[in-house]
Amino acid sequence: MAADLKPRDEDLDLFGLTHQGLVRSENQDHFLIGTLHRELAVHGTSLPMSQLLLRGERFATFGVVADGVGGTAGGAAASRRAVETIAQYVQSTLRCFSVANPDHEAAFVEALRGAALEAHAAVRAMGGDAEDYGPATTLTMAIGIWPRAYVLQVGDSRCYVYGDGALRRLTRDQTVAQDFVDSGALKAEDVARSPYRNVLSSAIGGRSADPVVSALNQRRDNVVLLCSDGLTRHVTDEELGVALASIRSAEQVCQDLLRLALERGGTDNITIIVGRARHPMS
């Protein structure tokens, strides 16, 4: 069936944006959307180059969001370095996992964790001898190798997927407040008022980074959302689900969600990525 076939490049609907918000003095967020292809390098030919400059088969699609930790020196530089490092790692290392063979999935998951730790080391190196107060950032990446998808997370930038009429959050906030909830010391409904809601328990470049990887099957018309907490502090999960359910295009959803967050104060930097694989006729 066509629904089970790997989506063509023209079936992909991908869009991302970032906004400083209405309060912060700078934007410390960064994002990247990319596809990895097999390509031909031509070193000499008598043929017209227009016949040869064709990308090979796409074997992976990915999106990354990084939110530089506010209040630390170099938060913007940290998020940029994290995104650059993980993109380079993906390009140079993950090609060997171009087929998500179940027998190789454990090794692939470890490679993703290795990518996060590589970014952690790169950002830590920016801080010199600083033990506690160097630059830091969140990092959340979704990477699809059809028909599987993987979500890598450090920090509290989130990943959601909407499908079959329901929204699922695929990440757990790595914050002190969430740790309190998990231990029973704090009620989930009290997190928004907790002074620890934005205190990261794990961060790229922080004291420690604890990369978490989850895996799922991809389906056409599932909608994936990656975002920094500048969106989710103003827009509820229920509202996210409504927006993704009514998608006309990835760009439209990103713009609608950004507008809603800004209307409600835009108190932090806001970064949003939306992606889906459409059915060929949609």
Regions found by a protein language model. Give the residues of each.
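PP2C/PPM-type serine/threonine phosphatase catalytic domain
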Residues: M1-S282
